[in-house]
Amino acid sequence: MASTADFKNGLVLQIDGQLWQIVEFQHVKPGKGPAFVRTKLKNVVSGKVVDKTYNAGVKVETATVDRRDATYLYRDGSDFVFMDSEDYEQHPLPESLVGRAADFLLESMPVQIAFHDGVPLYLELPVTVELLVASTEPGLQGDRSSAGTKPATMETGAEIQVPLFINTGDKLKVDSRDGSYLGRVNA
């Protein structure tokens, strides 16, 4: 059990037999009335996001989530195979569980897998990943009417928006949470 004062992003709650992860939370102290906590919760299994409000100080049931370090090995059909860094056990995770993270996975990449009662719940990638640009069109300075970006296909197959000066073969830092360009990697 945890109080609303213990809320933090990433905390997993057990509500009506389902697991919900706190994506955002905000403590609100209005001028009149009692304080409350506004949360945005994501269902760990389905990915559905809901808003829920709790009175301040309310006790909620938390789920025990074990985060284990692992390494991405290879793709086997629709499964992604990871090796636990502690006991070297291999864990095949279905494509539905890996989700958008599949766009940024490289072989031998360190990741974290969250387990609840021995069942994998979700995958956490490093916030920034370094990827090579597999292909992109040459960007010309005068050929745009808006911001200077163009699509680029990365070595993993992900397509992201990059500045016009990026060329095929460049190594880039990419935010794995939203697929945004962060910068070039200096060689």
UniProtKB/Swiss-Prot annotation:
GO biological process, one term: peptide biosynthetic process
GO molecular function: translation elongation factor activity
Gene Ontology annotations for the cellular component aspect, listed alphabetically: cytoplasm
InterPro entries reported in the protein's UniProt record: Elong-fact-P_C (IPR015365), NA-bd_OB-fold (IPR012340), Rib_uL2_dom2 (IPR014722), Transl_elong_fac_P/YeiP (IPR020599), Transl_elong_KOW-like (IPR013185), Transl_elong_P/YeiP_cen (IPR001059), Transl_elong_P/YeiP_CS (IPR013852), Transl_elongation_fac_P (IPR011768)
Cysteine disulfide partners in this protein: none
Pathway: Protein biosynthesis; polypeptide chain elongation
Localization: Cytoplasm
One Pfam family here: EFP_N
Keyword annotations from UniProtKB, A to Z: Cytoplasm, Elongation factor, Protein biosynthesis
Role description: Involved in peptide bond synthesis. Stimulates efficient translation and peptide-bond synthesis on native or reconstituted 70S ribosomes in vitro. Probably functions indirectly by altering the affinity of the ribosome for aminoacyl-tRNA, thus increasing their reactivity as acceptors for peptidyl transferase.
UniProt similarity note: Belongs to the elongation factor P family.
The name this protein goes by in its record: Elongation factor P
Gene that this polypeptide is encoded by: efp
